């Protein structure tokens, strides 16, 4: 399989399928896809980092709440996933719905899901 074929196959995957692929790769190769965390060595460096405003957020579904069907419908609207994928995502909460969303997009998604009873976090 050529590199281009692999990239094309990945482009055609849903978010849920990509998540399963990442988990399978982590298990197969004994690695983690989590970004390495830099430790601030000096107090000045930590202060400068705190002054910068975060521009990209991950929208995480923390809990579906009691209105699961409404949450699944809202997740489908927000992510464009099919019914099966959206249900699996909601059932598997906490799960990331959208990565690197702008603050406005993140807040809009959060508001839409909280409106139907879900608990959502911006990280």
From Swiss-Prot:
Top-level taxon of origin: Bacteria
Molecular-function GO term, any one: mRNA binding
InterPro entries in UniProt: Ribosomal_bL12, Ribosomal_bL12_C, Ribosomal_bL12_C/ClpS-like, Ribosomal_bL12_oligo, Ribosomal_bL12_oligo_N_sf
Any Pfam family the entry gives: Ribosomal_L12
Gene3D superfamilies membership: 3.30.1390.10, Single helix bin
Keyword Cytoplasm applies: no
One biological process term in Gene Ontology: translation
Keywords per UniProt: Ribonucleoprotein, Ribosomal protein
One term under GO cellular component: cytosolic large ribosomal subunit
Coiled coil region boundaries: none
Homology family: Belongs to the bacterial ribosomal protein bL12 family.
Its biological purpose: Forms part of the ribosomal stalk which helps the ribosome interact with GTP-bound translation factors. Is thus essential for accurate translation.
Quaternary data: Homodimer. Part of the ribosomal stalk of the 50S ribosomal subunit. Forms a multimeric L10(L12)X complex, where L10 forms an elongated spine to which 2 to 4 L12 dimers bind in a sequential fashion. Binds GTP-bound translation factors.
Protein name: Large ribosomal subunit protein bL12
Organism, as annotated: Clostridium botulinum (strain Hall / ATCC 3502 / NCTC 13319 / Type A)
Organism taxonomic ancestry: Bacteria, Bacillati, Bacillota, Clostridia, Eubacteriales
């Amino acid at each position: 399989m050529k590199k281009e074929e692999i990239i094309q196959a990945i482009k055609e995957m849903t978010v849920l399928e990509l998540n399963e692929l990442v988990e399978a790769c982590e298990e197969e190769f004994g690695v983690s896809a989590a970004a390495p965390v830099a430790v601030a060595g000096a107090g000045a460096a930590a202060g400068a980092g705190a002054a910068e405003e975060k521009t990209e957020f991950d929208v995480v579904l923390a809990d579906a709440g009691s209105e699961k069907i409404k949450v699944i419908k809202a997740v489908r609207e927000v992510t464009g996933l099919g019914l099966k994928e959206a249900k699996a995502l909601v059932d598997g909460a906490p799960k990331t719905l959208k990565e690197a969303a702008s603050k406005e997009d993140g807040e809009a998604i959060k508001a839409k899901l909280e409106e139907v009873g879900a608990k959502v976090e911006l990280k």
